[in-house]
Structures are given as structure tokens and as C-alpha cells.
């Protein structure tokens, strides 16, 4: 491959050098007519190839050498004009191509030939060259004006982690290439415009000088000289102007090309883009068809022609409408509610196989269950679930992948968190889920296993549900069951789905309203530490919706407190009103278990600092004794819900107490006096004493 590239580079260098030498030679040396024919054929070939290349490139930057190509092709044409002019004036002959073009264009009438030449020259000079020059000028100015903003956007994406350093370098290089290309095109279009003017002047000089030379040196009459030299001069002009026109069109295609990023990645050509963009509206085709039918009714117009065209356009529009309907049908299987928060990607569907990489949350479906799912209903259920999750915790939705799995039972599903599976849930065909079925009806139902978000869930046939209005109101279809199950998992494991990427996204959102606060917070605390604080808050179900209060707390305490655990406690203290309201449900009354001072001191002394952080090293027997006494207090003070009862202790040991009891008493929350403050009226129900 390296050898092949080296050969290509060498041949390219030789070709350009040979072209420059040929241009100089054409201006100086007399050339035989056979060589002039060959060079004229080469000129036409180059112009056709260049036009085709510009039509098939995916973007303008794919042919960044175009301004240089314009310069070389213009010089080649002008040199050929000089060489052919010498041959015409010296020998009254310039080869077969020029003479054939002259006779073809003139067609036996010199005036017709001149008119055709002037029309082509006018079209090239006034329409194509002038328009392309203006577009190039405006494009160069706009590109230059937009460059600082684009560079800042690349830097921002790099800092936010949306781009890798290598991708950022590539984008900067592409941006520099784009600016150089537009600047080069702005100047190169002057070549095209000047070439058209030079072609017109050279032709007029050839005709006048040819008549003078024919009369003076070749003893021709004025008519003979005009006929001979005018035909050759017009032929020479046409042979030059047609390639020049093609090059002008190629330049116009280059600088008017607008490709969106998606189509550029697909390597789409100009023809593909035109067809794709013109084929977006069936209504436009129907309107055009009706107008053409109107033209067919105009007296004197060829009715058959316009009826045929109207029919063709109508059929095309009908086809477009059918394709649009098919596309809408395909989108009916999409699940936009599963997209990650802030994602601009395409809405996912139920995939046939597992994703290539680990996803935050995945749902595996058995074959029969996947076949019977109502996809729009599933999307609606997830949409409601993600809204409820955002309102409850402020958690950015991590995105969900759903795929079919032959390894599962056909009528079951399984929820996975970072590829760790939960208990499979079997779904009897057509049954509804009743979250808390009365005892009297359980004999007619099937117990639902693997659903941690319901106290006594059962599957029951729709026929039994229809007989009871209360059951009809609480019955859930499988789509709702899956969505509620996944949202419950997201709630309980919310801290697993917040990392640096999600933190950056939240900071960007907050920046819109509080740019100064976000800047100060990032100065005080690195983004990674902010992410750690948010994770620890979510780990104990503390909502992170109030990002303003969290960031203000980090600005105050971040520079002072280097221990992340204590920093979280200070943030919790500043969120005390919110935490108190959440803990008491707005009642301000909290039944609490207090720790004896000796217990607090024992826990405090068991906290050992290590290079990796502080850890609780309490003796297992002491831990067991504490758990036993806590259970005794809880049994002696029953409450409606376990979460209504809580331990209240000092701020410096609160986290360690929570970590100690979590494996045994997960529903028992632990708060500190400092965070509850005056927002809660504590009602002690017991004191823990060792």
C-alpha cells in the first residue's frame, strides 16, 4: 500500500510538472496541427472529468485542490488559444478539431456562427462566471466570520467530552481546509471570469487579423479571407469556450454545494441530494401535475405532451406519498422514550440481538412476549415513567435498550443493569397484573415473581377483571408492567447512572440560567468530584433537581472540605429543607431512633483514614448487637411504612451508620441533626444503647 501511494504521489508530481512545461511550450514553440488536435482533445477531457468529479464528491472539502486545478486548466486553455492562433494566422490551418467545430457551428452561415459564439460567451461570462464569483465571495466572507465560533464549539465539545482529542484535531484541520478552500475559490473565480473575456477578445482579434493577413499575404479576396479565417477563428473559440463553460459549471457546482453532515458521511453525490430533496413533498408533485393539466387545456398547446407530463408527475407524487406512509409505519415501531437524555440519535426499536457494548439498562424479551407487545403503548408507558423519574429525582434518563433473547422463556422478560441480570418475570399470555390482589381472588390468579415494586402482585385473566370495577381500574397490561419495573430499578439504582458525562450535561443545562454559578462551581470543585457528590446524594434517594442549591453549596464548602464524604454532608445540610419535607411528607413529624453518646463515640473511633478514603472498622459482633437492638426498637414501635421511622445522629458519623445498617435494614433511613435542623419535630421512640 505504501509503495502504491508513493507511485501515485510521484506520478502526480510528474504530471503537474509536465503540464507547466507544456503550458510554457505552447506559448513559445510552433506546434504541428496533429499535436494541437491532441491537446485540444485533452483539454475537453479534463473539463468533462472535472465536471463529473465535482458532481459526485460528498462535500466541497473533498476536492480542496480545485482552485489550483482552475488555475492550471485556465492557463492550458489560454496557451492552446495562443498556439492555435499562431497556426491559424501563419498557415490558415489549425487541425481537424478546430475546422470541424467551425463548420458545425457556422453551418454555412457566418452570422449564425458569430451569434452562437456570442450567446455561449455571454451565458458563461454574465450568468455562470458572474454568479459563481459572487457566491464564492460571499461564501469566503461568511466562512471567515464563522471560523471563531466553530473553533470555540470544537473546544467546548472537547472539554465536555463529546469529542476525543483526535476527533478535535481532525475537525480543526477540516475547518482550516474549508476556510482555505473558500478563500482560494474566491480568487480562482477571477480566472474563470477573465478566461471568458480573453476568449472573446482573442476571437475578435483572430477574425480581424485573419482577414488582413488573408488579403495581404495569401492574395485572397475579402470574402474568401473572411470565410476562411472566420470559420477557423469561431471553431477555435468554440473549442476553447465549451471546456471553459464546463469548468465554469464545475466551479459553480463546487461553491454552491451544501451538504449536511449526515449525507456527507453517506458519501452522497449531487444527483442523489437533488433527488432526495426534491422528493420530500408529494403535495408539490400533485400541484405541479394539476398546473400541467391546465397547460394542456390552453388552445394551441400540444395537449398530448402536457397530459403525458402531468400523468408522469402525478404517478411520481403518488409513489412518494406511499413511501412516506410506509416510513410512518416503520416509525410506529420506534421507541423515542428509550433515548438517553440529550441524545439526538435515532429512536431505538426492539432489536433482534443484544447491543455490541454494555448499556446502562437493558430489557431482554422472550420471543412470544416480544411478538405480542403493543409498541406505541410501551413507548407511552416509558414516556410517563421517565417524566416521573425526572420529577422525583432529577436523574438524567440513561437510555434503555430492548432486545429479543431466545435464551429466555418465550413468555418472560428480564431487566439488566450494566449487564447484571435481575430475576426473570414470567407473563402469562393475555393476563393483566393486579399490584395488590385481594385474598379472595388469589385462587383464580397466578403469583407474579420478580416484581420488587409491588407488595403482592398477581396475574389474572381479563375475564375475571371485567367482573370487578375496582380490579379493572388497577389492572395493568404487560407494557405498563415492564415500564414500571424498569423505572423502579432506575429509582433504586439511580446513583449507578450518573457519571462524568451526565454531570457535564446537567452543568450545560444549568449554564443556560446560571452561567456564573456554574463557572464558580467548576473552579471550586472538579467535574469528577461534582459527579461523586451527585452519586452519593442519589444513593440515598436525595433528589438532585435543585442544582442551583447544590452548586452554591459546593462553591462554599468545596475549597474548605477535601473529604468527599463530609462535603456531601455539608451539601445535605444546605438541602435540609428539601430532605426534611421528603422524609416527613410535609407533616414535620418524624418518629426517630436516637443513638446514645457512647454508641456515637464508638462509631467515631472506629472510622479509620486510609489513602483510598475513610472506612468504618467496627467489630462484627458490635455491628450485630447494634442491628439486634435496632430491630427490637422497630418491633416495639410499629409504623405504617418502614421508611417513616429513621435514625437521627451527628453529621460526622451519619454516613458510616447508614453504611453499617444498610445490608440489614435497607428501609431504615439515617439523618443528621444538622440537616433536619428546625424543619422537623422529632418524636424519639427509642435510644440505642450498647
From Swiss-Prot:
Annotated Gene Ontology cellular component terms: plasma membrane
Bilayer-spanning residue ranges: 14-36, 48-72, 104-128, 196-216, 229-253, 291-315
Topological category with respect to the lipid bilayer: Multi-pass membrane protein
Keyword entries, A-Z: Cell inner membrane, Cell membrane, Hypersensitive response elicitation, Membrane, Plasmid, Protein transport, Transmembrane, Transmembrane helix, Transport
Compartments (UniProt record): Cell inner membrane
Biological process annotations from GO: protein secretion; symbiont-mediated perturbation of host programmed cell death
Pfam families: FHIPEP
The keyword Cell membrane appears for this protein: yes
tRNA processing in keyword set: no
InterPro entries to which the protein is assigned, alphabetical: FHIPEP_1, FHIPEP_3, FHIPEP_4, FHIPEP_CS, T3SS_FHIPEP, T3SS_HrcV
Coiled-coil region list: none
Top-level taxonomic group: Bacteria
Family membership: Belongs to the FHIPEP (flagella/HR/invasion proteins export pore) family.
Its biological purpose: Involved in the secretion of PopA, a proteinaceous elicitor of the hypersensitivity response in plants.
Name of protein: Hypersensitivity response secretion protein HrcV
